[in-house]
């Protein structure tokens, strides 16, 4: 009787495993495999760097891989539980689940922009990948998504893994910099600090609703931002998180 019950339990377990197999674990880290796994989950690998060898700080991670939103993010996120449950911070919650799963698969630990204080040094990490640069308006620009940067997390490795060499010039070098003149209230402009107060005040007006529904004018003006394939719905969600109290 006990053996029959055990066999039944084993059959149930095998059936459950077939329907919901555990994530594949990669004992030997492959950047290409990580890139593919991130893409399948709705993310892109935005850059990687050997941090410890650059800083000489023993407590720093040996390798950091930054993952963020790309063209496949919105269709996957918007149909996820987090994207539909109406609870606060849906993108952060989705990111921690997805990036956490990637970390389990590739034997990494994680860091998130929402962690803190103290906050992980995402800007420093990003600039060390040689795929992020400072734009004329002061915010970072990326080689494939322009000013539409949304880093969702970092995978941290305690050993140096093989990563692609990135020796790129800033996309701003040969650009006419429309980002510096597009903001209707000059909150983002060349050679000046970001005027956060002016930005938020504008978003409270009827004129500012195009930014709320489609995204920041300056970010959209960047020619490279087209590579992010942002939908208006995604931009609106990010803008609502940035400015939750719009009162046009």
Where are these regions (language model features)?
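Accessible peptide chain termini
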Residues: 1-2, 25-29
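Non-ligating segments of multi-cofactor redox enzymes
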Residues: 27-248
